[in-house]
Amino acid sequence: MNENIAEKFRADGVARPNWSAVFAVAFCVACLITVEFLPVSLLTPMAQDLGISEGVAGQSVTVTAFVAMFSSLFITQIIQATDRRYIVILFAVLLTASCLMVSFANSFTLLLLGRACLGLALGGFWAISASLTMRLVPARTVPKALSVIFGAVSIALVIAAPLGSFLGGIIGWRNVFNAAAVMGVLCVIWVVKSLPSLPGEPSHQKQNMFSLLQRPGVMAGMIAIFMSFAGQFAFFTYIRPVYMNLAGFDVDGLTLVLLSFGIASFVGTSFSSYVLKRSVKLALAGAPLLLALSALTLIVWGSDKTVAAAIAIIWGLAFALVPVGWSTWITRSLADQAEKAGSIQVAVIQLANTCGAAVGGYALDNFGLLSPLALSGGLMLLTALVVAAKVRITPMS
């Protein structure tokens, strides 16, 4: 029955791709991600200006992720049948307002309020991004459209911190956020001009969000999503101490490694649609298996700089398949409830990121330098096994 509903949902899709709207969504995503991580490179001047410690200033990133998790869970219940075009415009306005509130913040409270606004937009936008994409392009083009959106994410992750640091030294941290607000205005204009009307789901399609987990293979999919992202953050959060102490990279060398990782991630995302067209399940099982082998290689031969640098590139290429692949899984296997599935997915990812980083840090402090790698590799291997054995992928119609 669920398959029949999904097939009908896909059959009602668009006949021709609306690439202008897809790129508008991608631009909004890139701006959201960039602003999310701007404080990472601006903590010191922000803390000094507001008279707080850098640790306290760092909570401006934490509160964004925390609010985003709850926003992703409840946004579809709140917006219900509202035209998604207006919702995306609202998120772009919230992005702009957040930047301005942070720019003019004269207290830590106002700073957190501004960052909470960003969390609302970030979580809500991610929750509906997959369903938006599948309504802007034909079913066969969805992986390509998703690769465009996640390619924008990769670019934002590469440039956010260095760009913020560079501009902050020239124009000051407040003007960096003013510049980001201008980007938010551009988001609003582009979305208004390019995004068509996208009515909310009809009442007969409404279903309790968590009842989706009772569908065959869905709970297994969410567990696999959790393990893959927890595995990523268990290692990547601590890549600096691992690479500097295990492989002996200095700061400049580590910068090049991270840049290589970012470029590889962008390349992997750009070509992910070609892999996913052949087999979504193979990509979702093969990528974490390759990452598990990469973690094992680092544990055994990571003291060699060449090996360590090569693994960073392989890791960036392989993990790039993971977010695009799971979003494609939602558009294929949960097409009739893509928004609610996206809400659960985003919340699971946010929780996984937090747990992965926390457990990885505990392991590093208590079990040694290689323990985050072992934890990450183990989680990636389990992910591959769960996907191969339990996750179902609906064939493309």
Swiss-Prot record:
> What does the UniProt function comment say about this protein?
Involved in the efflux of purine ribonucleosides, such as inosine and guanosine.
Supply one GO molecular-function term.
purine nucleoside transmembrane transporter activity
Instruction: List each coiled-coil range.
Output: none
Per the UniProt entry, the disulfide pairs are none
Cytoplasmic domain ranges by topology: 1-21, 76-85, 129-147, 197-215, 277-281, 327-343, 388-397
Q: Which GO terms describe its cellular component?
A: plasma membrane
Q: What name has this protein been given in UniProt?
A: Purine ribonucleoside efflux pump NepI
Which key words are in the record? Answer: Antiport, Cell inner membrane, Cell membrane, Membrane, Transmembrane, Transmembrane helix, Transport
What does the record give as the reaction this protein catalyses? inosine(in) + H(+)(out) = inosine(out) + H(+)(in); guanosine(in) + H(+)(out) = guanosine(out) + H(+)(in)
Entry membrane topology: Multi-pass membrane protein
**Protein family:** Belongs to the major facilitator superfamily. DHA1 family. NepI (TC 2.A.1.2.26) subfamily.
Q: Which regions face the Periplasmic side of the membrane?
A: 43-54, 107, 169-175, 237-255, 303-305, 365-366
- In which compartments does the protein localize? Cell inner membrane
Query: Where are the bilayer-spanning segments?
Result: 22-42, 55-75, 86-106, 108-128, 148-168, 176-196, 216-236, 256-276, 282-302, 306-326, 344-364, 367-387
Entry's InterPro entries? MFS (IPR011701), MFS_dom (IPR020846), MFS_Efflux_Transporters (IPR050189), MFS_NepI (IPR023680), MFS_trans_sf (IPR036259)
